[in-house]
A protein has these predicted regions:
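Intrinsic disorder/low-complexity segments enriched in polar/small residues
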Residues: 4-8, 19, 39, 71-78, ...
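N-terminal export signals
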Residues: 35-63
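N-terminal secretory signal peptides
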Residues: 1-35, 58-61
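Structured, non-membrane catalytic/scaffold regions adjacent to prosthetic-group chemistry
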Residues: 71-447
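N-terminal export/assembly segments and adjacent metallocofactor-ligating motifs
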Residues: 25, 55-63, 68-72, 151
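A generic N-terminal leader/anchor concept
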Residues: 12-15, 22, 40, 92-95, ...
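Short, intrinsically disordered, low-complexity terminal segments
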Residues: 17-19, 45, 58, 66, ...
Length: 447
């Protein structure tokens, strides 16, 4: 930070966390990396969060209090709406970008078993096309490295192949981007670019078998009907793909229903791909064509740094080298606290808090979820409900005791069956800000 320069926001100030502690709270940091809050500094932090802090001595150095840091995307320009205004969608969704429209779900609206359609996050790369008046006449083209190219109307797709229905998580690659330091470019998602829905459709594998994959088939090239923001019909908004092996996974679906109802326009009506466990951009909306290629697809959204991460760690804030990247496929382990909401106030004298949430990790499954009320000094295991399938999220519940009134931070972290655990700090910095899966933290005030 340049000498004499004033920071304009709490995010900018905490670009140098220990300096921020000193400026705001007068906190000194020891070798344990947990700060010492005393006298005026302790009073200042208490005033900032609105209550005394029972576990103040445990606060890690440079920690932005959760009441400020979590679930609050950076504000857009004054002309941008901060809450969503879109038919069929919950107005409490938070807009993180308006061109194209992108909106995330507050954690408390994510649901338990499934995320309601109206609360499901929105991720677009271009415009949202109108839903067709006669959806069953929508045609999906299958071509490329196949023996029998197909043009299948949706109505025929529904009757020609076995219908499947599965609860599966979709998550944007940028979920958690707001927690990278220094900031990475892109929509500043916090925890809500994710949702779990029950998807109904047919296996893509069954359709590709009907088309007859050639031995040269390597990768899919998927396309949708979303218009480019420029209005130029010759420009493609997005065209991503997957290896043929993932396309043939029995859980990869061509879906036309979401939570028992036909897809609505923001979620890809009338037909979309659902590629569970992989980054959300692979689950193309408004799907109208799948071309099978004899090499890795190089369409829009497959080159440069788009949906790619460094092969080796790079210095945070550096430009990176496009040649030293790999395609980002799966998402890391993550948990979220769905209740209570961040910033909840409980009645004076409350001495226990009931928690609920969910955790997921691609197809690896969840081994355990742990929660803490004392800034991570001690942890307690949550109770896990069994998932309903390999790509469902694991719902969890827990109860934590609280010693007194005051300000608490409830932290949650998950560990998957491969042994990976959510980190406290996003250590996998990359230019596009993919895969930040830090602990979920919420603030709770008692009294």
């Amino acid at each position: 930070m340049r000498q004499g320069r004033k920071e304009r926001s709490i995010d900018e100030l905490y670009g140098d966390p220990e300096r921020a502690d000193a400026v705001i709270f007068g906190r000194r940091t020891g070798v344990s990396r947990r700060g010492f809050l005393e006298g005026a500094g302790l009073a200042a932090m208490g005033a900032a969060v609105g209550a005394s802090i029972p576990f103040a001595g445990n606060i890690p150095a440079g920690l932005v209090p959760a009441v400020f840091a979590q679930d609050k995307p950076a504000e857009g320009k004054p002309s941008e709406p901060q809450n969503l205004v879109l038919p069929g969608k919950d107005p409490n969704l938070i807009v993180v970008g308006d061109k194209p429209l992108n909106a995330e779900t507050p954690a408390e609206l994510l649901g338990d078993d499934v995320t309601p359609v109206e609360a499901f996050f929105i991720r677009n790369h271009g415009g949202i096309p109108d839903a067709p008046a006669e959806p069953d006449k929508w045609v999906l083209k299958i071509d490329g490295e196949v023996e029998r190219p197909l043009d299948i109307p949706l109505g025929e797709l529904k009757t020609k192949f076995p219908v499947q229905e599965r609860p599966m998580v979709l998550e944007c690659a940028g979920n958690g981007r707001a927690f990278f330091i220094p900031p990475a470019r892109g929509n500043q998602w916090t925890t809500g670019a994710v949702g779990c829905a029950v998807w109904k459709g047919v296996r893509l594998a069954d359709v590709l078998k009907a088309a007859g994959l050639k031995s040269s088939a390597v990768y899919t090239a998927n396309s949708g009907a979303d218009p480019h923001l420029s209005g130029d019909p010759s420009r493609q908004t997005l065209s991503r793909g997957t290896p043929v092996a993932k396309a043939m996974d029995e859980n990869t679906l061509l879906a036309w229903e979401m939570n028992g109802k036909p897809l609505i326009a923001p979620h890809g009506a009338p037909l979309r791909l659902v590629v569970p466990g992989w980054v959300g951009s692979c689950s193309h909306k408004w799907l109208n064509r799948i071309t099978i290629r004899d090499k890795v697809h190089d369409g829009q959204g497959m080159g440069g740094f788009s949906y790619r991460v460094p092969v080796k760690p790079i210095v945070p804030g550096s430009k990176g080298d496009e040649a030293d990247t790999r395609i980002l496929e799966t998402m890391p382990v993550r948990s979220v606290i769905m209740g209570p909401a961040n910033g909840a106030r409980l009645a004076a004298g409350t001495r226990a808090i009931a928690l609920k949430g969910a955790a997921w990790s691609s197809d690896k499954g969840i081994r355990e979820v742990e929660v803490s009320s004392n800034f991570g000094v001690t942890w307690e295991k949550a109770k896990l409900a069994p998932p309903r399938g390999p790509y469902d999220w694991s719902r969890w519940t827990a109860t934590l005791k609280l010693p007194s009134d005051g300000y608490y931070e409830i932290w949650a972290r998950a560990t998957d069956n491969a042994g990976a655990t959510q980190p406290f700090i996003a250590g996998n910095w990359n230019p596009q800000g993919y895969g930040a899966n830090v602990y979920h933290r919420i603030a709770v005030l008692v009294g």
